[in-house]
């Protein structure tokens, strides 16, 4: 949103649905994400960096769950090794601090001035053919069947 009237209208609309709302600062930057997988022995594996590039300013439901020509999803390969390592370490740290189990997709913004901003964690990320989590894990050389076996093994261990 770029004007006070847009903010007022959005807050008014939100209050129609609930009396508690969250207003966040808009962060301009690239939307990047890391798949984190916990092996049975507790080792955390962090994937390469995935990126969502949308023509629109907002990554909508339709773009996430339907075939969209407006959005490109893939491996981000233009960041330095140092930045990639820092993002992966932050993803694993978020996973640990929140005491996650099994898997999560950790999303960040990477701003034009090089700031890494935690956005959200998805403790049950999508597994559709369009979903980033399985693509990122398979890019690490872990097959889909290995991924499922790792998750089942971890669940049995924790049970």
Which stretches of residues belong to each language-model region?
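A long amphipathic alpha-helix within ATP-dependent nucleotide-binding catalytic cores
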Residues: 11-20, 65-111
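Cysteine/selenocysteine-centered motifs that mediate thiol-based redox chemistry or coordinate metal-sulfur cofactors
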Residues: 147-159
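Flexible, glycine-rich terminal cap/loop adjacent to redox cofactors
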Residues: 122-144, 156
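Conserved metal-phosphate-binding beta-hairpin within the catalytic cores
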Residues: 25, 36, 95-127, 137
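Active-site nucleotide/adenylate-binding loops and adjacent lid/helix of ATP-dependent enzymes
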Residues: 1-30, 40-41
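Short, charged, low-complexity patches
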Residues: 84, 141-148
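Oxyanion-binding "anion nests"
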Residues: 26-91
């Amino acid at each position: 949103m770029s004007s006070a009237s847009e903010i007022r209208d959005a807050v008014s609309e939100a209050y129609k649905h609930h009396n508690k709302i969250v207003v966040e600062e808009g962060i301009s930057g690239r939307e990047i994400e890391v798949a984190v997988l916990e092996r049975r022995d507790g080792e955390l594996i962090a994937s390469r960096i995935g990126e969502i590039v949308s023509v629109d300013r907002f990554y909508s439901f339709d773009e996430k769950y339907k075939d969209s020509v407006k959005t490109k999803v893939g491996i981000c390969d233009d960041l330095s090794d140092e930045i990639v390592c820092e993002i992966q370490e932050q993803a694993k740290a978020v996973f640990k601090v929140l005491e996650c189990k099994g898997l999560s997709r950790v999303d960040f913004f990477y701003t034009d001035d090089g700031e890494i901003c935690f956005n959200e964690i998805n403790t049950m990320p999508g597994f559709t053919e369009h979903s980033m989590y399985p693509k990122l894990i398979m890019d690490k050389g872990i097959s889909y069947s290995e991924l499922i076996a790792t998750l089942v093994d971890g669940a049995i261990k924790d049970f």
